[in-house]
Swiss-Prot record:
Protein source organism: Naja mossambica
Enzyme class: hydrolase
Keyword set includes Lipid metabolism: yes
Tissues expressing this chain: Expressed by the venom gland.
Additional detail: Negative results: does not have anticoagulant activity.
Principal subcellular localization: secreted
Gene Ontology MF, one: calcium-dependent phospholipase A2 activity
GO CC annotations on file: extracellular region
Identification of the protein by name: Acidic phospholipase A2 CM-I
Disulfide bond annotation, renumbered to this chain: 11-70, 26-117, 28-44, 43-98, 50-91, 59-84, 77-89
Length: 118
């Protein structure tokens, strides 16, 4: 769920508050359209699409609780997760790892969605 996703982000990017990723570019945050502004925004676009695929399986990605571990910045989804838990956990894990590898460009925080994301 979103709370667990926030904690995963803190695991892989402890130096930056999670809310910096909640309003970034065209895809980090609620909804998303247009062309991603950079690599970090593309991480969010992929995450949005991953949640969409989980929904097609009948899952509720924003609410699904799953089991995972964070150890020294490394995330692992539990093998004991059911189909939906595993799908959502993997979406969040891939995104959190992607965030860790993408540069954060301050100018792309809180962009004007109407101007930049058509």
């Amino acid at each position: 769920n979103l709370y667990q996703f926030k904690n995963m982000i803190h695991c892989t990017v402890p130096s930056r508050p999670w809310w910096h990723f909640a309003d970034y570019g065209c895809y980090c945050g609620r909804g998303g359209k247009g062309t991603a502004v950079d690599d970090l925004d593309r991480c969010c676009q992929v995450h949005d699409n991953c949640y969409g695929e989980a929904e097609k399986l009948g899952c509720w990605p924003y609410l699904t609780l799953y089991k995972y571990e964070c150890s020294q910045g490394k995330l692992t989804c539990s093998g004991g997760n059911n189909k939906c838990e595993a799908a959502v956990c993997n979406c969040d894990l891939v995104a959190a790892n992607c965030f860790a590898g993408a540069p954060y460009i301050d100018a792309n925080y809180n962009v004007n969605l109407k101007e930049r994301c058509q």
